């Protein structure tokens, strides 16, 4: 079972989403409300207690919620080296749906920063395989993502993760990461492209057609607003129902903290619209 090998959290409401009922219809019959199973993919270095605040948005409304954050060393180093180790984690994550027998329920992804996007890109690829092609995704929310090759922003994010490490170790890891990025994605970019497609390019060309909501801020110093706006334009060009909301002043993955009511309403309205589609 994938659940034995993945450090995840699942919240199941007392009344599961597929068993909830609306008030009786005019004909006297109750109509079934199928809330989606929500999968939260955390940012690099994210703690489960951080994701729990977002999880509450959906759990309070009767959704089953799965929370997972990929290990930071895979996010920053494996992907930068072109090693698709996150694909294995993405497969285990999707296997959870079968373990809990919820694979027939609609799915909503809520993806945070590039750390979540790097994992999500493999989810998209796996959804094209025989094992997972019957899973029904109804929508995806992107929070502070995706960003395209912002080395300074990535170093800021990694520095925040390593904040409590020894100063010398922190410096060595930051230098190592910068060298890997420059070597594989600048100097050797044409060679790297032969065996590994950057996650940003993969998302731009993704064949998925469900609605997408991009929540970002021009004040974000980790993922640049222009990268997200360019992604939205690319998705619209592929006839995907993509919408974006600029929070203007909030920092990276801080939109819920700064605008809790507005952020929550955006997520809930998007979820409900996706389920009705």
Curated annotation (Swiss-Prot):
Record-annotated membrane-spanning stretches: 171-191
Main location: nucleus
Presence of keyword rRNA-binding: no
Keywords: Developmental protein, Dwarfism, Membrane, Nucleus, Transmembrane, Transmembrane helix
Any one annotated GO CC term: nuclear outer membrane
The keyword Membrane belongs to this UniProt entry's keyword annotation: yes
Membrane topology: Single-pass membrane protein
GO BP term, pick one: negative regulation of BMP signaling pathway
Subcellular locations according to the entry: Nucleus outer membrane
InterPro entries hit by this protein: AB_hydrolase_fold, DUF829_TMEM53
Gene3D superfamilies given in the database record: alpha/beta hydrolase
Role this protein plays: Ensures normal bone formation, through the negative regulation of bone morphogenetic protein (BMP) signaling in osteoblast lineage cells by blocking cytoplasm-nucleus translocation of phosphorylated SMAD1/5/9 proteins.
Disease: Craniotubular dysplasia, Ikegawa type: An autosomal recessive, sclerosing bone disorder characterized by proportional or short-limbed short stature in association with macrocephaly, dolichocephaly, or prominent forehead. Radiography shows hyperostosis of the calvaria and skull base, with metadiaphyseal undermodeling of the long tubular bones and mild shortening and diaphyseal broadening of the short tubular bones. Affected individuals experience progressive vision loss in the first decade of life due to optic nerve compression, and deafness may develop in the second decade of life.
Protein family per UniProt: Belongs to the TMEM53 family.
The protein's name: Transmembrane protein 53
């Amino acid at each position: 079972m994938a659940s034995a090998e993945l450090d995840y959290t699942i919240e199941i409401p007392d009344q599961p989403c597929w068993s909830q009922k609306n008030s009786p219809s005019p004909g006297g019959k109750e109509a079934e409300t199928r809330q989606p199973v929500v999968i939260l993919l955390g940012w690099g270095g994210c703690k489960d207690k951080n994701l729990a605040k977002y999880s509450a948005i959906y759990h309070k409304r009767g959704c089953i919620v799965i929370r997972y954050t990929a290990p930071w060393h895979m996010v920053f180093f494996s992907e930068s080296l072109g090693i698709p180790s996150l694909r294995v984690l993405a497969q285990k994550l999707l296997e959870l749906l079968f373990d809990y027998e919820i694979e027939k329920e609609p799915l909503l992804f809520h993806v945070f920063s590039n750390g979540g996007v790097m994992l999500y890109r493999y989810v998209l690829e796996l959804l094209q395989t025989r094992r997972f092609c019957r899973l029904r995704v109804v929508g995806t929310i992107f929070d502070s993502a995706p960003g395209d090759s912002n080395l300074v922003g990535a170093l800021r994010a990694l520095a925040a993760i390593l904040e409590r490490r020894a100063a010398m170790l922190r410096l060595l890891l930051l230098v190592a990461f910068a060298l890997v990025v420059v070597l594989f994605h600048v100097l050797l970019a044409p060679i790297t492209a032969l065996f590994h497609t950057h996650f940003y390019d993969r998302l731009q060309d993704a064949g998925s057609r469900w609605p997408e909501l991009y929540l970002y801020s021009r004040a974000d110093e980790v993922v640049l607003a222009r990268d997200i706006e360019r992604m939205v334009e690319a998705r619209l060009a592929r006839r995907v129902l993509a919408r974006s909301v600029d929070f203007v002043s909030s920092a990276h993955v801080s939109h819920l903290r700064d605008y809790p009511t507005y952020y929550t309403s955006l997520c809930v309205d998007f979820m409900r619209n996706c389920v009705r589609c």
